[in-house]
A protein has these predicted regions:
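Domain-level signal for soluble alpha/beta catalytic cores
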Residues: 1-371
Length: 371
């Protein structure tokens, strides 16, 4: 078993553009022209190939590119008892584009069961070697909590949970169980992807909650509570990190706003080992909130964008790293893209060649800064 621990000086979030043969196989499966077994064979081949490419690129963390899921978050939720989903033709409005998502809601109490993602991890783990370690990405507990209390789901959720605190308790316990399942399968590096903090930054979110008669500080407290509850009893030798961004769908974003208003919660109090933070443009604000990061955490600066094909200016990125250094020591900093390349199957509006060029730039800059 590899003993390497994330994050690394140059790192990435997790998802990669789906190769054409995988897209074709999934389409054929949906049309009924190939079997699940045939789709699994193609998926296994594509995962094997993407891992090999990560190694060739010189990266130490390896992921399965999230090739086995449609959405970065919803598919994982479907692996719990009490959760169902359906294609309802709905979606979530991003900046200039409607994200085509599947309705995901409760049909009972949330409970853990043998989670299919653990088997997905086992397939990935076989590729570990002395230079690499398998990292698995799942949505944060707060993301699942938020999914069940959105306006279109809250009435259904109240059939099973009279209060948010009861829902938080069950989600936290279910995650504790699944984390132990990952650990038993040999996972020592788990990443919790979390858009909930990014969704409540800025004045727009504050005004939205005020109009609903909800104290936004109570919202922040609940997000922190469910995330930390899930981490209670975690194995001591398991690294658990959190990636925070403001939405990433087909090169569009969901929200904008600086981290200032949530730093006292997630930066200071969330019990993770590192934070992978979106910082690729002005929407994320400045680096001053990094001063609130507790001393036991590392920070991975997401300064390279996956939303646009153009390569960043190396000197400007290096300058931004040193700007961040004013608030947190350089030895606790790392570098990565701001998010994945394909948070959902549709992927961002870049090519595979541009994807690898972005990662080559991340590595080049990191090796120069932390030489």
């Amino acid at each position: 078993m590899s003993t390497l621990k994330t994050p690394f000086r140059y790192d990435f979030v997790g998802s990669f553009l789906r190769p054409e043969k995988l897209k074709a196989a999934k389409k054929a499966f949906e049309e009924g022209t190939i079997t699940q077994k045939e789709l699994d064979r193609v998926t296994d081949e594509c995962v094997t190939e993407i891992v090999a490419k990560q190694k060739v690129a010189g990266y130490h963390a390896i992921t399965d590119g999230e090739f086995r899921r449609k959405f970065w978050h919803l598919d994982f939720m479907w692996g719990f008892e009490g959760v169902t989903h359906e294609k309802d033709g709905g979606g979530v409005q991003f900046n200039g584009e409607m994200a085509d998502l599947e309705a995901t809601y409760l049909v009972g109490k949330v409970k853990a069961k043998v989670h299919p993602f653990v088997e997905y991890f086992k397939f990935l783990k076989q590729f570990e070697d002395e230079q690499t370690v398998a990292k698995y990405t799942i949505p944060a507990p707060a993301q699942m909590y938020q999914q069940m209390i959105v306006p279109q789901n809250i009435e259904q959720t109240r059939k099973f949970y009279a209060t948010d605190d009861e829902l938080i308790e069950d989600i936290g316990k279910a995650y504790q169980d699944v984390i132990k399942q990952f650990y038993a399968a040999g996972c020592r590096n788990l990443q919790l992807d979390d858009c909930t903090w990014g969704a409540i930054v800025g004045d727009a979110a504050k005004q939205r909650y005020q109009s609903l008669g909800v104290d936004i500080e109570d919202v922040k407290a609940r997000l922190l509570k469910v995330n930390n509850l899930a981490l209670e009893g975690r194995p001591e030798d398991m690294v658990i990190t959190s990636h925070i961004c403001r939405g990433n769908y087909h090169s569009t974003f969901f929200t904008s706003g600086p981290y200032d208003s949530v730093a006292d919660y997630v930066f200071a109090q969330e019990h993770v080992d590192a934070l992978l933070l979106e910082y690729d443009d002005a929407r994320s604000g400045g680096f001053a909130p990094l001063a609130k990061v507790s001393p036991d955490k590392k920070v991975v600066l997401g300064l390279i964008t996956t939303k646009k094909p153009e390569l960043e200016d190396k000197d400007k990125v290096i300058a931004r790293i040193h700007e961040a250094e004013k608030y947190i020591p350089l030895e606790r900093l790392c570098l990565s893209p701001q998010c994945g390349f394909a948070s959902c199957e549709i992927g961002n509006k870049i090519t595979e060649e541009q994807q690898w060029a972005k990662l080559a730039l991340v590595k080049e800059i990191a090796e120069e800064v932390w030489k």
